[in-house]
Amino acid sequence: MEYDEKLARFRQVHLNPFNKQQHEQGAGEEAPGITSQARLPELPPGEPEFRCPERVMDLGLSEDHFARPVGLFLASDVQQLRQAIQECKQVILDLPEHSEKQKDAVVRLIHLRLKLQELKDPNEDEPNIRVLLEHRFYKEKSKSVKQTCDKCNTVIWGLIQTWYTCTGCYYRCHSKCLNLISKPCVRSKVSHQAEYELNICPEAGLDSQDYRCAECRAPISLRGVPSEARQCDYTGQYYCSHCHWNDLAVIPARVVHNWDFEPRKVSRGSMRYLALMMSRPVLRLREINPLLFNYVEELVEIRKLRQDILLMKPYFITCREAMAARLLLQLQDRQHFVENDEMYSVQDLLDTHTGRLGCSLAETHTLFAKHIKLDCERCQAKGFVCELCREGDVLFPFDSHTSVCADCSAVFHRDCYYDNSTTCPRCARLTLRKQSLFREPGPDLDA
């Protein structure tokens, strides 16, 4: 009996946090037999009191032991969420720094903001592929990678926002920004134009652009009003801060003229164009700057290795073992190396400058020479014997100590060839045979 009386008194003094009727009753009238001091215990000093109106959702911050699960909120519209966010901010400021309660309040604030973003940008069913201005956009499925929209220059929250990436130029943007894009895909320019601006920073002046961004035509000024003008070192034109993010890129004109590989600030469009053109062999150095080979020793070595590989190519084309082993695929990343020795890409020049291309090309050269001179008997049988000295060693046109006749492709020792005033005995023999054929025509011409 005594226990029942104590339990009844306890229930009268302490309100049930899950019974809102008691809260409403306690707000208007006092429970019988309960003094105002005993009705609500005072909070200890330093603990802020969070009072939420009845019409606003319960954030779970006013009660420690019966808080709602993280992420569960009763807000149904944007206005309620904004009010809840402001109240949650105030609670965070009132709580002691680095306390557990403050950390929990910060977590709830984050979830409130995510919920607000969901209401402002609902997750609608978007098509997986969108084609716009030659862009081919694919809907991304990544939710954790942080990206920036190339159109509005804001962060893409992949967890709650739908975003797309162009497979041609890697242009990224929100789904809501797709219809605002006005710049065509750079991939089309690479496919049709495929050339570089080879003048170093060809500046024409801001007045030639009518004091507007060269891409989006927004008003710009050098004094920062209304928008800061940023110059692209590749095109020489000026852009606004939305079209020029101070990205760095190697400028091809500075490479071929000054052998300068220092990255410079370029616009977003120029950065994408240079990235797509990086591996395209469109630079003919002998025409652009032939003196570059006189001052860059690495280029001379690369040119010699490429010439040797072109001399090895006929051996591989006529060799079954080489075709089965697919030796020429060793250069599949630089297919132009097995086609000519004149065209270079910016990536080739960059790798030459760092030394990577010289090492990899020397290894490939050694592998090719080993197959021809040691591993394959058929390729060995296609070697030459010097007709000037008649020594027994087999010569190949890619050997460093040989010379090749430009007319008949015969191979000789270099010293022997120049000691005989570059006279080719094979060419002389073929000339005599042709003369004899014209003088004595008959049925046995091949005798």
Swiss-Prot record:
Write down the superkingdom of origin. Eukaryota
Q: Which UniProt keywords apply?
A: Metal-binding, Phosphoprotein, Repeat, Zinc, Zinc-finger
Q: Per its UniProt record, what Pfam families does this chain match?
A: C1_1 (PF00130), RH_dom (PF13901)
Q: Does the keyword S-adenosyl-L-methionine apply?
A: no
Keyword Zinc-finger attached: yes
**InterPro entries referenced in this protein's UniProt entry, alphabetically:** C1-like_sf, DEF8, DEF8_C1, PE/DAG-bd, RH_dom
- Provide a Gene Ontology MF annotation, just one: zinc ion binding
| Region listing for Disordered, in residue ranges | 17-47
What are the recorded Gene Ontology BP terms? lysosome localization; positive regulation of bone resorption; positive regulation of ruffle assembly
| Modification Phosphoserine occurs at | 436
Zinc fingers classed as Phorbol-ester/DAG-type: ranges: 134-185, 364-424
Protein family (similarity comment): Belongs to the DEF8 family.
Q: What does this protein do?
A: Positively regulates lysosome peripheral distribution and ruffled border formation in osteoclasts. Involved in bone resorption.
Q: Kindly state the subunit structure of this protein.
A: Interacts (via C-terminus) with PLEKHM1; this interaction is weak but increased in a RAB7A-dependent manner.
Q: Under what name is this protein listed?
A: Differentially expressed in FDCP 8 homolog
Organism field = Bos taurus (Bovine)
